[in-house]
Amino acid sequence: MVTLAERHGGHQVTPEIYAAMIAEVAALVDSFVAEHGGLGDGHIHLLGTSGTVTTIAGVHLELRRYERRRVDGCWMVDDQVTRVIERLLAWSYEDRVANACIGAERADLVLAGCAILDAIRRAFPCQRLRVADRGLREGMLVQMMREDGVWGGDGSTP
């Protein structure tokens, strides 16, 4: 993502620059698909962990500040993801910096991350994206604990 942002720029990303980022990533994803095959009939969902997808979820939820407990486990349908990416693309660099879910640390990188996600979404169309702010193993453990009734999800239990 950093390399993509450095190569194309991350401050003033036009729709044309964004399309070029997607095309660059799509070439890599397409070679993966050619070697390993697709994912069938589209009755799948994507799982995104940390970084761009958590930023997208935070913006989607219109959080005043990033809240891990609200973002972690969030489901987004394809149209919601698309709308947030379109919003981010329409924002200036300063607008991205001002958003508490993005900030100065990520404002120049978030659109490169969105381009990567868009290339993946085009190669593997699906209706839903699940957002994980925690690692996959931690998320699976939390889910099992919830199913067993030992995790309240309010942050007060491990």
Question: What role is predicted for each listed range?
Answer:
Residues 1-158:
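Helical "lid/coupling" subdomains associated with nucleotide-phosphate turnover
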